C-alpha cells in the first residue's frame, strides 16, 4: 500500500526498525492483529503479498498494458485486488485518519504500567512524525489543520514513548501548542484524558455525572437513548469522573505539567477553564442550555451530592461497562471506549485481573502497521463491510463468470456465513437486537449496523442466486436478518446506523464534545436507507412470501424519505463518506430499484444535473472532506478515482441518456489505473460526526471495479470517444 505521507527528513531522526518482521495474524473470528516476529520466525513465514502491500514493499507484479475496454479494466482491477484476500476469505483495511485515537491506547498502557509490545513504540513515533503538519502540530485527523486536541494528545504520546522534550519534533509541536494557547484550550475529551493522566485537574472538566444511569429509562434524555457510540464513551468517562481517578505523579507527569501549558501549572485555576476551548478546535459550541446545566451540576457535585448516590451511580456505570465488555469479548464498540474501559477496569479490578489482561490484549485488534508507522484504526477492522461490497462488485460486473475468480467468491461467502450473529446479547446494556445481523467489522464486536447488515444480506443473496455457489446462509437465517432490518425504521421513514432513534434531535442541544456534530442521537441517513431498500428488494426476489406486505410498505416509506432528503440543487448530503457524490450513488440506486429513472423521475433528473455540473474537464469528480464539514460541495486540487466512481454509478443508476459524460468519466478511471491493475490513493474517502475524515483505501478498488463493470453491462463494453 502506498503511504499517504512519509517525511524522511523527520522520520530519520528517530529509531527505525525492520518493517519486514511484521506479520498479520487472523484469528478464527476474523480479528486482525500485527505481530513483530524474530528473524528466525520471519524466515519460516515469508511475507505474503497482502502483508507486503500493507507494509509498502514492492509486490513485483507483472506490468499490464492499458486496458482497452471498461470490463478489461475491471478485470485488471480485481486481478490485483484478489491478491489481497486473506486466507479466511475477507479483505482487510487500515481504516486510518483520526488523530485522537492512538492516545487512548498509549495512555491505557502507561497508566497501567503495562510494557508496550515489541515494535509498537518506534512505529507509533514514526506514524506521528510522518503525519505532523508543517507547523509542527496535529489536527483532529491527518488532513486537518493543527488543533489543541490533536497536538496536545500526540505530544504526550511521543513523550510517553520516550521522545526527549528537546527533540526537534517535540520542540516544534510544543511551540505550536503554545501558539494555540496551550493544553488549557483542549476540548472535553482532551481534558478528560489529561485529568486521567494527572496533567490537568478534574475541577476543570465539565460534569460527567454517572448518576444519569440511575434515571428511569423513560426519561427522554436518559443516556440509554443517546447514539450508542456517545453513550458508550461517556459511560467510562462518567465512571472516571465520578471517582476522580488519575494515575500517580511521576517525573514524566511533572515534566508534562510544565510543557503543556503557557502558564505555570500550579498557578492555573482549572475550574475557570471548563469552557476554555481553542477557536481552532471548536466545531460545535455549547448551547446556553448546556452551559446552565453544567453550572447546576457543578454546584450539585460541590455542595449537594450525597456519597451514597455517588456510589450508586459509579456502581451502575461499572455494571454497564462490564456488560459492554462481556458482550463484545472485550473488543468494545470502538477504540475510544475500548481504551477508556481498559483504564476503568485497571483501577477497579487491578492489573492482574483477567478482565484487564483481556482488555490489553484486545487493544491489539485496533492497531495497524503501514509504511508511515503504526496507527489505531477507527474500529477493529472493516471485515464484513469490505467483503460485502467486493462480492457485490464481482456479481454486478459479471466477473463472477470467470472460473479463476469463483474460489475467491466462495471463500468470501463462507466468511460472511461465519460472521452473521446467531446469538442474542446478554444483559440490559441498551443494545439493539443483534440476532441475525451482520456487524461492521467482525462477529466479536457484534454490534448490529443497518447498512452493513443490508449490504451483507444483499451480497449473500446475489451470490447464492448464482448456480455455482452453495446456499450457506439458509432461509431461516436470512429471515432473521430481515426481521432485524424491518425493526429499524425511524418515524421519519429513514434508517439510522446502529438502532432506531430513541429520542428527539433536540438532544443535540446537550452535545458536550465541542469537536463533533450530530452525535447525541441516531439520525436517519440516505445511505443507510438505500442499503436497506436494495437488500429488501433482493430478498423479496429470493424469498417472495415472507412478510411481503410489510417489506413493500417499508420500501415505499423509505423511498419517500430519500426523496424528501434531496436538496433543492438536486444533491443529497453524505454523512459516512465524502460527500455529495457518495450520497448520490446510494439515493439514485434506491430510486432506480423502484423503476424511477432520468426519463420519468424529476428527482433523478435533478440529481444528474447536479452531478454533471460538478464534472471536471478531465472527466473526473473531486470532493474534499470540507464538503462534510461545511455542507457545501468542495473540491480538492485534482480529480479522485473514488468520487468519480460514485458519481458515475449514480448517473448509471439513473439511466442518464447521454453516454458521453459518463464515458468521459469511465475513460478517467481507466487512464488512472496503474500497470499492476490498482489505483492510487490520493485522499481520504470517509467521514464521521461531520468533522472527522477517515480512510477507506479499498473503496478505490472495488467501487471502480463495480462501476466499470456496470457501465459495460448497461451501455456496452466499448468506448466511442
Curated annotation (Swiss-Prot):
GO terms for cellular component: cytosol; endoplasmic reticulum; endoplasmic reticulum membrane; lipid droplet. SUPFAM superfamilies: Terpenoid cyclases/Protein prenyltransferases. The keyword Disulfide bond does not apply. Its main location: other. The active site is at residue 451. GO terms for molecular function: lanosterol synthase activity. Its EC number is 5.4.99.7. PROSITE patterns: TERPENE_SYNTHASES. InterPro entries: SQ_cyclase_C, SQ_cyclase_N, Squalene_cyclase, Terpene_synthase_CS, Terpenoid_cyclase/PrenylTrfase. Belongs to the terpene cyclase/mutase family. Lanosterol synthase; part of the third module of ergosterol biosynthesis pathway that includes by the late steps of the pathway. Erg7 catalyzes the cyclization of (S)-2,3 oxidosqualene to lanosterol, a reaction that forms the sterol core. The third module or late pathway involves the ergosterol synthesis itself through consecutive reactions that mainly occur in the endoplasmic reticulum (ER) membrane. Firstly, the squalene synthase erg9 catalyzes the condensation of 2 farnesyl pyrophosphate moieties to form squalene, which is the precursor of all steroids. This is Lanosterol synthase erg7. It comes from Schizosaccharomyces pombe (strain 972 / ATCC 24843) (Fission yeast).
